[in-house]
Amino acid sequence: MSGKGAPELSVRNCGDLRVAVIAAQWHEKVMDGLVDGALRALHELGIDEPTLLRVPGSFELPVVAKVLAGRGYDAIVALGVVIRGGTPHFEYVSQGVTLGLTQVTVDTGVPVGFGVLTCDTEEQALDRAGLEGSNEDKGHEAVTAAVATAATLRTVSEPWR
């Protein structure tokens, strides 16, 4: 299981952060779990009014993330699912999404939580979606990582806090 060795992140004083969640629509059951996990994590962190936007698929996540990064968000969470099929499409989409979201983060300085599952099978995706019986909750993890990074960046840019 890939979740072994995950850090326990302590995130405090982040209720005032402006956070957006962007979620793809492919693989509805998996996406419902990822979105629920993300919203639960935000609520646990005291961020009760996040922006939630839906896009057609994972490939559309980077362009929306880039626009949101330029509109004053402190953190963005990108959620999607890409499941391997019988053609190279999986590799192209997975690489494009990964590089695109990384570029948004590096270019803008706004953390983007990477909650895009790239799996060989639907069963692997369901096991990571945070649903009842899942072993992992990648939506929750992506929020925690993005918000923790935003909180860290706040201390770097505002040392008086």
UniProtKB/Swiss-Prot annotation:
Top enzyme class: transferase
Annotated catalytic residues: 89
Record's keyword terms, sorted: Riboflavin biosynthesis, Transferase
EC number annotated for this UniProt entry: 2.5.1.78
Binding locations of 5-amino-6-(D-ribitylamino)uracil: 26, 58-60, 81-83, 114
Catalytic activity annotation: (2S)-2-hydroxy-3-oxobutyl phosphate + 5-amino-6-(D-ribitylamino)uracil = 6,7-dimethyl-8-(1-D-ribityl)lumazine + phosphate + 2 H2O + H(+)
Any Pfam family matching the protein: DMRL_synthase
HAMAP family: Lumazine_synth
Listed NCBIfam families: lumazine-synth
Name under which the protein is recorded: 6,7-dimethyl-8-ribityllumazine synthase
Organism of derivation: Streptomyces griseus subsp. griseus (strain JCM 4626 / CBS 651.72 / NBRC 13350 / KCC S-0626 / ISP 5235)
